């Protein structure tokens, strides 16, 4: 029998539903790794839209309805949180830190991996490494390798994960990457575009609350602000934060730079002041970042050479909603403009909205800070003193 012409062979493969393996040059393009030097690109909140696994632990893949991942950069560490929702609305979460030793390193090691199920946290013993691959701005491709097997995980940034047609169109590219990495394509997980997550509702409900303030509109955050409600997690200053009495923030915007001053008064009337300058981060992330700051306590100034990321959310004219991730932990901070911060009934009525925003952002609501409406600040009183009338 003579050789089958190439075009006939391709037609036969198409009829049989068989795909030709990706060419080496195509694999080279798809598998370009993200190094430590460029790891800022993985920061953010991500929704798993496609995955395939070669693993003995099938329970991790079976009955999965959604998986939501948060990557927070803290200096040389990537804080990793993965929340998996299964059929029946049961949740399993994983927590770890990722690290790489050199700027050119392409693999990140998992440290202190923990698993949480039904409120019980326990160590999850798996010596794993992670590799990220270059992809589109709102996409994340990640390969996990550990004792339990290998996983290829394809994500879309939270907020751009619901267009089912776009996700379907991208599946062919995901499958090519899997084949390039040597995965067996059997029954991939495919997100349906609508399922909720463990810690929050899908963005139909949260979209209104989490609209970010962009660089173009940053002037709206300028002013003097009083903290009226806040929640934190993974805080390195949790003891001090529990003793917080008031927090007063001054923000001034000049040529795209936010000059930030925070004055915190503790319950023993001692004060801590933090100052830094923030600039806009990557356009697609709508964040503002700083790389250093100064902390003053009892007249002693300490220079902090640490990274922090801030995101502001659209809200009312005299309101400020701010999410902070960095050296001090992860905080949601709700402010009222100085002068409209004292109406306790109004503040109480707004607490439900603050809690909804916290849940949308993945915070556990435990013991929030709530301003009492009257306590003074480090540098001034909460209310101007009323002078007695002259006879």
From Swiss-Prot:
InterPro entries to which the protein is assigned, alphabetical: Calycin
Signal peptide: 1-20
Subcellular location: Secreted
Keywords: Glycoprotein, Repeat, Secreted, Signal
Keyword presence, DNA repair: no
Cellular component, GO, one term: cytoplasm
PTM section of the record: Glycosylated.
Sequence repeats: 24-202, 203-391
Any GO BP annotation: response to toxic substance
Glycan attachment points: 54, 63, 97, 234, 268, 277, 307
Single annotated GO MF: toxin transmembrane transporter activity
SUPFAM superfamilies: Lipocalins (SSF50814)
Quaternary organization: Homodimer or heterodimer of PSTBP1 and PSTBP2.
Function in brief: Binds both saxitoxin and tetradotoxin. May play a role in toxin accumulation and/or excretion.
PANTHER family from the UniProt entry: ALPHA-1-ACID GLYCOPROTEIN, ALPHA-1-ACID GLYCOPROTEIN 1
Record protein name field: Saxitoxin and tetrodotoxin-binding protein 1
Organism: Takifugu pardalis (Panther puffer)
Taxonomic lineage of the native organism: Eukaryota, Metazoa, Chordata, Craniata, Vertebrata
Gene name of this polypeptide: psbp1
């Amino acid at each position: 029998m003579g050789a089958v012409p190439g075009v006939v062979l391709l037609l036969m493969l198409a009829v049989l539903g068989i795909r030709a393996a990706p060419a080496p040059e195509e694999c080279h393009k798809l598998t370009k790794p993200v190094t430590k030097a460029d790891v800022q690109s993985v920061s953010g909140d991500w929704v798993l839209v496609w995955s395939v696994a070669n693993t003995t632990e099938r329970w991790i893949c079976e009955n999965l309805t959604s998986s939501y991942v948060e990557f927070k950069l803290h200096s040389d560490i990537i804080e990793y949180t993965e929340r998996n929702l299964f059929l029946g609305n049961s949740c399993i979460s994983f927590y770890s830190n990722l690290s790489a030793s050199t700027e050119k390193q392409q693999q990140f090691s998992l440290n202190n991996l923990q698993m949480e199920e039904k409120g019980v946290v326990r160590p999850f013993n798996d010596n794993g490494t992670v590799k990220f691959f270059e992809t589109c701005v709102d996409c994340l491709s990640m390969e996990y390798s550990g004792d339990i097997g290998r996983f290829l995980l394809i994500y879309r940034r939270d907020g751009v994960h619901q267009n089912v047609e776009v996700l379907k169109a991208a599946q062919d590219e995901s499958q090519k990457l899997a084949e390039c990495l040597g995965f067996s394509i059997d029954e991939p997980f495919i997100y349906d575009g609508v399922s909720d997550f463990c810690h929050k509702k899908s963005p139909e409900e949260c979209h209104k609350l989490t609209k970010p303030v962009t660089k173009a509109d940053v002037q709206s955050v300028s002013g003097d602000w009083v903290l009226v409600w806040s929640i934190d997690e993974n805080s390195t200053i949790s003891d001090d934060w529990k003793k917080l009495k008031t927090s007063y923030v001054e923000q001034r915007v000049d040529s795209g730079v936010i000059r930030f001053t925070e004055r915190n008064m503790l319950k023993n009337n001692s004060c801590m002041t933090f100052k830094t300058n923030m600039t806009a981060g990557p356009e697609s992330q709508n964040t503002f970042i700083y790389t250093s700051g100064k902390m003053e306590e009892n007249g002693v100034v300490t220079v902090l050479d640490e990274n922090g990321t801030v995101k502001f959310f659209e809200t009312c004219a005299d309101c400020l909603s701010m999410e902070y991730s960095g050296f001090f932990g992860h905080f949601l901070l709700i402010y009222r403009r100085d002068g409209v911060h004292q109406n306790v009934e109004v503040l109480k009525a707004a607490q439900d909205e603050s809690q909804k925003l916290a849940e949308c952002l993945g915070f556990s609501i435990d013991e929030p800070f709530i301003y009492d409406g009257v306590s003074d600040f480090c540098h001034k009183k909460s209310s101007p003193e009323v002078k007695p009338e002259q006879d």
